[in-house]
């Protein structure tokens, strides 16, 4: 699970050594390092499958986390993601294509739609999701909490659910307001209700 952090850790160690920090201190710090919040972060809530939250919000980022998640998936790989509003809309179908190529179950939802209509953003992602191969599925669920709940309720033991796009963020920007929203808390909330 920590593969995503290897390059960052190697860079940090190189800098620490260049700054002449002793090796024991470096090892002690690394032993206490749980990873960067919202970056390939495991969310444990007693579920029979793996849930990972990641900030991946670009085509390259989504591809990398899904490839890593695929390498640890014994069952189906789920991805719940959306794209931000008022941002590069050309990446939306590209991210849809990546999700469909690398995941078994794709759930497209809202991210931070900002001033854009969430349905328009989802439709632009869905342009790449028209020809769904046999054995795969695509769901379009605009409300992010509902999309996450859907994946959590449908996943089976040994599946991996990647909730991508918001990572460490604890808010969602909807038109003229910002609300509290944290993907990690939504997972915990779902399992507390069970």
What does each model-found stretch correspond to?
Residues 11-194:
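ATP-dependent carboxylate-amine ligase
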Residues 1-4:
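Conserved small/polar residues in nucleotide/adenosyl-binding loops
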């Amino acid at each position: 699970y920590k593969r995503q952090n290897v390059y960052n850790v190697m860079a940090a160690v190189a800098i620490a050594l260049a700054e002449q920090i002793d090796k024991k201190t470096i090892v002690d710090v690394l032993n206490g390092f749980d990873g960067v919040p919202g970056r390939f972060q495991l969310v444990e809530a007693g579920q029979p499958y793996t849930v990972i939250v990641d900030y991946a919000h670009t085509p390259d980022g989504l591809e990398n986390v899904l490839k890593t998640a695929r390498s640890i998936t014994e069952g189906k790989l789920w991805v719940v993601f959306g794209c931000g509003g008022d941002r590069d809309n050309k990446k939306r179908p590209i991210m849809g294509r990546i999700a469909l190529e690398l995941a078994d179950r794709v759930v497209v939802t809202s991210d931070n739609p900002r001033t854009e209509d969430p349905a328009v953003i989802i439709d632009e992602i869905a342009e790449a999701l028209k020809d769904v191969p046999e054995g795969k599925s695509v769901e379009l669920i605009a409300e992010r909490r509902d999309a996450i709940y859907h994946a959590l309720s449908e996943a089976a033991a040994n599946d991996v659910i990647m909730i991508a796009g918001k990572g460490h963020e604890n808010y969602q920007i909807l038109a003229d307001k910002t609300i509290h929203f944290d993907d990690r808390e939504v997972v915990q909330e779902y399992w507390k209700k069970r």
